[in-house]
Amino acid sequence: MKLRALLVGVALTGLASPARALAPELVPYAAYARGPAGQHLLASVREALCVAAGRCDSLRLVAPDWPAPPRPLFVTLAHGRRTRACLGSEQARGTLTETARRVAAEAMVADRRHAPVAAEELDSLRVLVAFTGGDQALSDPYAVDPMREGLRIETERGTVAFLPGEARTIAWALGEARRIGVLAALADARFIRFEAVVLAGPAVLSTPRRSVSTSTPEVQP
């Protein structure tokens, strides 16, 4: 299942959420993201974007595989605080490298809220890779602390997700969900609170064919 989502805020500004214990299923992903594996994953995503944009000719970079049972994965391209494109996958689509490559390539062209991303735009964009977990269904979206917790809104019209720190208020998140056509009546929606581990860095390879990214990823939380 593909998910369209808004992933901005803490991931785009670099602001850290208050310290808190991660959901157990995300602990291995936090360790993965903070180590060399996170650098490899960001490099493989950058390469996939490069190939999708027609600026590289082949996929060669491979990251270590899923460090634990697969989690939903999102890839976002952003310019400052503005989301340029974002797509996610609830299910693994092969290895972690294969899944991230496919989602990254699709994010370039398949986010129906935005025009396709042009190759030359990558030079000014940042890429974010997010793993989510700790899902908890809620009857009241206002029970979410938007600065510390993520909110996913699911309806028959689609899905929108907000990372921890993206929505300053839940009212804003609900308004944004309505604006993009996902949400109508609250009673028709399913609300899920979640946590996220996010890697972020430039969207372009500093050296197209290096086996390891030369820039250190930013990791939240």
Locate the predicted segments by residue.
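Basic nucleic-acid-binding interfaces
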Residues: 22-221
